[in-house]
Amino acid sequence: MLPLTYVVKAFSIGLFFSLFLMKPLISWLKKQGFQDHIHKDHCEKLEELHKDKAYIPTAGGIVFVFASVLAVLLLFPIQLWSTWFCIGTILLWGALGWCDDQIKNRRRVGHGLSAKHKFLIQNCLAAGVVLPIMFAYKESFLSFHLPFLGIVSLPHHWWSYLLSFAIATLAIVGTSNSVNLTDGLDGLAAGAMVIACLGMLVVACTNGAPWAFICCVLLATLAGSCLGFLRYNKSPARVFMGDTGSLFLGAMLGMCAVLLRAEFLLLFMGGIFVLESLSVIVQVGSYKLRKKRVFLCAPLHHHYEYKGLSEKAVVRNFLIVELICVVVGIIAVFVD
């Protein structure tokens, strides 16, 4: 079969899995009490703006995990260790988000794992992902695809492996948290992920990395499942992906960038995620240093809500920005 056949099959698995499993999943989540309680510390205005979202089922992102496992089992050779590496990675990152949503559900105050504990677990999981890739890729792990510049290789020294390991770990953890920050409006994170995954898929299909095929299948599955999820997550949302979905999606996108040796390309392919994270970093840094806020509220999408833009307008504009970033990213790959 041609690689395109695998891509179409993976996309179809993700799409139909989300479309047909989501309805019974929403009913089950309601029965289990997985509901968004819209508790925002020191953000009374934000609670007021989002009061209509209270008690909407959350943790719907578990469908992305199921779809990804199914796609890997159906399309990857079962005897290869890389197949089980993918399944283990998918399940562990899915479990992290699920546990976080479980804790939120039990406490019913909008808080799950503490930021420190979550960050520590994320780094451990990311390291567990990067190390096998580093040993499998060997010298290839020292090469990076820099936008507009092409392939750049580091010298074969121990510090090169350490630097490459740090960059790869940062890409996975950073993207995971960035998608999590972006998941604050109906259809925003899922819509941006569809665009980002399709953009990275174009890169993966033309990439010569050892495990590029794995990326093609995963990215196509995620794009399809996010597209199907949008039917239920677009405004007015009937379900949220929760941390189960956002942490998982970001980690998978980051892992694919690592596999393609294209971590720096995430600056374009995940452009809107980068902007959301930067807005939080700038906001927190400014307040700690100057006791002044740069934005009315962070992440960035809430800033525009505070300025009076409707939720649909913010989502539409952000998705346009993400599309532009992805187009620039694709151009950056092929012009070098």
From Swiss-Prot:
One BP annotation, GO: cell wall organization
UniProt main location, coarse: membrane
Gene Ontology MF terms in the entry: metal ion binding; phospho-N-acetylmuramoyl-pentapeptide-transferase activity; phosphotransferase activity, for other substituted phosphate groups; UDP-N-acetylmuramoyl-L-alanyl-D-glutamyl-meso-2,6-diaminopimelyl-D-alanyl-D-alanine:undecaprenyl-phosphate transferase activity
InterPro entries in UniProt: Glycosyl_transferase_4 (IPR000715), PNAcMuramoyl-5peptid_Trfase (IPR003524), PNAcMuramoyl-5peptid_Trfase_CS (IPR018480)
Keywords, ordered alphabetically: Cell cycle, Cell division, Cell inner membrane, Cell membrane, Cell shape, Cell wall biogenesis/degradation, Magnesium, Membrane, Metal-binding, Peptidoglycan synthesis, Transferase, Transmembrane, Transmembrane helix
Localization in the cell: Cell inner membrane
Keyword Iron applies: no
Record's keyword annotation contains Ubl conjugation: no
Protein EC: 2.7.8.13
Organism superkingdom: Bacteria
Catalytic reaction annotation: UDP-N-acetyl-alpha-D-muramoyl-L-alanyl-gamma-D-glutamyl-meso-2,6-diaminopimeloyl-D-alanyl-D-alanine + di-trans,octa-cis-undecaprenyl phosphate = di-trans,octa-cis-undecaprenyl diphospho-N-acetyl-alpha-D-muramoyl-L-alanyl-D-glutamyl-meso-2,6-diaminopimeloyl-D-alanyl-D-alanine + UMP
Membrane topology qualifier: Multi-pass membrane protein
GO cellular component: plasma membrane
Cofactor: Mg(2+)
The protein's role, per its UniProt record: Catalyzes the initial step of the lipid cycle reactions in the biosynthesis of the cell wall peptidoglycan: transfers peptidoglycan precursor phospho-MurNAc-pentapeptide from UDP-MurNAc-pentapeptide onto the lipid carrier undecaprenyl phosphate, yielding undecaprenyl-pyrophosphoryl-MurNAc-pentapeptide, known as lipid I.
NCBIfam families in the record: mraY
Family under the similarity heading: Belongs to the glycosyltransferase 4 family. MraY subfamily.
HAMAP family, A to Z: MraY
Protein's UniProt name: Phospho-N-acetylmuramoyl-pentapeptide-transferase
Organism: Chlamydia trachomatis serovar D (strain ATCC VR-885 / DSM 19411 / UW-3/Cx)
